[in-house]
Design a protein with these regions (language model features):
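Metalloprotease/metallohydrolase-associated module, dominated by Zn2+-dependent proteases
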Residues: 29-149, 169
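Interfacial loop-to-transmembrane junctions
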Residues: 148-166
Length: 182
C-alpha cells in the first residue's frame, strides 16, 4: 500500500508509473514537456503519507471501539484486523531501525529512503523526518501494545511480530520480491 501511495500521486500528475517490489518508478510521458519541480516531492510524500494515514485510520477505529478491547480476554479476528491496520505506523519505526542498522554495518548513514529525500527537499538534517515519524510511531505502537492487546496474548504477539517482520523483510525485500514484482 505504501508504494500505491506513490503510484496514485504520480498518476494524478500524469506520469507513466510502475510499482516494483520495493519502489515505484515514474516518468513523464512527454519528454518535450518539462516536469514541474513540485511533483517529485509530492510523489515522494505520497508513500509515507498513505502509510501513516492508513495506520491513523486503524488507531481511530481502535479508540472508537476501545471498550470491546478493554473487556476482551482474548481478541477476536475483527479486533486483530483493526490492530493490523494500526500497525501500518510500524513502517516508520522500522525505517529508523534499518537506517541506524545500516550505519552500524556500513559505517555511514544511508541517503536513500523517502523520509531522507523529504528532509533533503526541505533542507532539513537527514535524521529529522525519519526520527520524528519514528518517535510518533513508537508512542502509538506502545499504546497499541500496552492498552489494546491483552496481557495473556502480548508475549505471543510481540515474538510472532518480531519474527514475522524480520522474515517478511528477508523473504520479500531480499529473496523473492525481485522475482515476483521486478
Amino acid at each position: 500500500s505504501h508504494e500505491f501511495g506513490h503510484y496514485i500521486v504520480a498518476k494524478y500528475f500524469g506520469y507513466d508509473t510502475q510499482i516494483h517490489y520495493a519502489s515505484t518508478s515514474w516518468r513523464y510521458p512527454d519528454p518535450n514537456n518539462p516536469i514541474v519541480t513540485g511533483y517529485p516531492i509530492a510523489i515522494t510524500l505520497g508513500g509515507p503519507i498513505q502509510t501513516m494515514f492508513t495506520g491513523t485510520i486503524g488507531i481511530v477505529i481502535l479508540f472508537l471501539s476501545r471498550n470491546s478491547f478493554f473487556q476482551a480476554d482474548k481478541l477476536s479476528f475483527r479486533q486483530w484486523f483493526i490492530i493490523f491496520i494500526s500497525l501500518f505506523w510500524l513502517r516508520q519505526t522500522a525505517n529508523l531501525c534499518t537506517w541506524l542498522g545500516s550505519y552500524f554495518v556500513n559505517g555511514k548513514l544511508s541517503s536513500r529512503g523517502d523520509e531522507i529525500h523529504i528532509a533533503n527537499y526541505y533542507h532539513l538534517p537527514n535524521w529529522t523526518v525519519v526520527t520524528t515519524t519514528a518517535i510518533i510511531a513508537t508512542l502509538l505502537l506502545a499504546i497499541i501494545i500496552f492498552k489494546f492487546i491483552p496481557l495473556r496474548q502480548r508475549g505471543t504477539f510481540l515474538s510472532a511480530g518480531l519474527t514475522g517482520g524480520i522474515a517478511g523483510y528477508i523473504f520479500w525485500l531480499v529473496l523473492f520480491g525481485k522475482y515476483i514484482m521486478p
